[in-house]
Amino acid sequence: MNFVPPEEVVSPKANWRLVDVVLNKGEGDCAYAIGMWDNQRRVGFRWNGTDNSPIGNPQSRGLPTWTMLDRALHRAVLNQVAKKNPDKANIMRAFLGMPVEADD
């Protein structure tokens, strides 16, 4: 793994404060995180890098960065997190103020 891990991506520092990476699909694939964007709770997204392009996308001035998803997509991301990384789903629900669903 020669790409920048999403846990180490902290830019753009003027806007973003990483709280937790909730889903990391690995090299060359996507990662989702929860954090504070301009003092609002948001879901961030990025493409992890590869050996040939370790920074991934998006990037700015040679630094790996996060981009924010439309809030309308938060529930869809939560559904993916619940399937792929269930331990992080309740953290994400609590952080975003979404109701915790009871197990059947």
Per-region residue spans from a language model:
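Negatively charged, low-complexity tracts enriched in Asp/Glu with abundant Ser/Thr
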Residues: 1-27
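Small/flexible residues
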Residues: 15, 19, 43-44, 48, ...
